[in-house]
Amino acid sequence: EYKAHCMAESGESLTRDSLSAMYYDLNKLYYGGACKVDKEVAYEWMRIPHFYNSFYVYKYATSFCAAVALSRGILSGDKEKIAAYRRFLTLGGSMPPIEELKTAGVDMSTPQPVCDALDYFAELIMQYQNLLNDEG
């Protein structure tokens, strides 16, 4: 997706052939010889809906980070965070999303929400490992 945007920004035409060649080359690179990459994989990009919505995967990941920040604020029981979340809900899309999130105390223009989500993920991994150790 990033490479396709770079191609477009540099003035290169996005054709079936150019996108297929790029996708094929990326598959060869990513699989690194571990799998046979047949010629038909070059056309796989056409069936992936993510490519039809700009930076869908990045939006999904960043929205997950925002959701973690919002939910942890609510679950903490902090009345100010809960009130900020309620105010956020009342905005109803009247502002750009990044500005709306700031009203809820989540500043996506900083790395903090991503760092916090990764920390939370690490906590979940530790919980999972502890559960496995308890079972074993």
Question: Which ranges hold each PLM region?
Answer:
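C-terminal, non-catalytic "cap/extension" segments appended to globular domains
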Residues: H5-G136
